[in-house]
Every structure is written in structure tokens, then in C-alpha cells.
Regions:
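Histidine-centered nuclease catalytic patch
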Residues: 26, 34, 38, 46-76, ...
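Short microdomains enriched in Cys/His and/or Lys/Arg
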Residues: 63-80, 98-114
Length: 151
């Protein structure tokens, strides 16, 4: 039986990097989206409840059959939870000396009340999925958020 995790790793396929709403809308529009997200979650991290600096994280759903990534919404995340979501990028920051990778692992284990083995298994599975998804070109569907893009 697989443990249900509160905080998960969500690696964006390499072929989808930079295909997101934030890169398509004006700064003022993105500010409205992120501030709305922060307010929705009471100015706290939606996953761990932390009240440190927040990030607006895009939630994507992937149709692995038709290779469509669809924007499903937004969630307010603290820096630690956000770095776990994007742990591949976080590893690069850690290699550059800009982030303590072990603190991210500890945060993952604390939030999920789990062992290092659970973290390692989850990370391995996430990277396996990322490698498979990165073999394909994806169509981006912004769904209800498409109208926010100025022509």
C-alpha cells in the first residue's frame, strides 16, 4: 500500500518548460492571480500551513495519452514546499550553493510524516515519470485562464 502524501514532487516535463500562464500574462495580471491565491489560502502555505514568503504555484494536470498539459488552478506555497514541488530545479540551486537540499528532504519528511525511504521512492518515481513525459511534445491548455492573455 502506498502512503498518501500531503506534499508531492511535481516535475514539469522538459518539453513544457516555460509553457505556463505566468510567462503569458502581464505582470499586473500575474500579481492579481498570485495575490488572489494567497488570500484564498489565508496567507499561509496550503500544504504545510507555514506563514513565510509565499509563491503562487500553477497546478497542472497531464493527459498522458493525448499529451495535453492543462492548467487546473493555483495554490499558495511557502518556499520550502515550492522547492520540493520543483525538486529538480532545487537540486541545481543546491549545487550552486543557493539552497540546502537536505533541509528540503527534511521538510518533505516532516510534512508527510515519513521516512527517508519514502522520500527516495517518491523522488525516483517522480523522475521516472518526468523522463517518460519529457519524451513527448505537449499541447498546453490554459482552460478557463486562456482569457487572461491579452492579444
Amino acid at each position: 500500500m502506498t502512503q498518501q502524501l500531503k506534499l508531492t514532487i511535481e516535475l514539469v516535463p522538459q518539453t513544457c518548460w516555460y509553457s505556463n500562464l505566468r510567462n503569458e500574462v502581464t505582470r499586473s495580471t500575474w500579481d492579481k492571480i498570485r495575490k488572489s491565491s494567497y488570500a484564498k489560502y489565508g496567507y499561509r502555505c496550503a500544504i504545510c500551513g507555514g506563514d513565510s514568503r509565499l509563491n503562487c504555484h500553477e497546478i497542472w494536470h497531464y493527459d498522458d495519452q493525448n499529451h495535453i498539459q492543462k492548467l487546473a488552478g493555483f495554490i499558495a506555497l511557502c518556499d520550502m514546499c515550492h522547492h520540493v514541488k520543483h525538486i529538480g530545479f532545487a537540486a541545481i540551486l543546491a549545487e550552486e550553493g543557493n539552497l540546502d537540499y537536505e533541509k528540503l528532504v527534511q521538510h518533505f519528511m516532516k510534512v508527510n510524516n515519513c521516512t527517508p525511504r519514502v522520500f527516495e521512492d517518491h523522488r525516483t518515481s517522480a523522475f521516472d515519470q518526468w523522463r517518460e513525459r519529457s519524451k513527448h511534445n505537449w499541447n498546453t491548455n490554459l482552460g478557463e485562464y486562456q482569457s487572461l492573455i491579452e492579444s
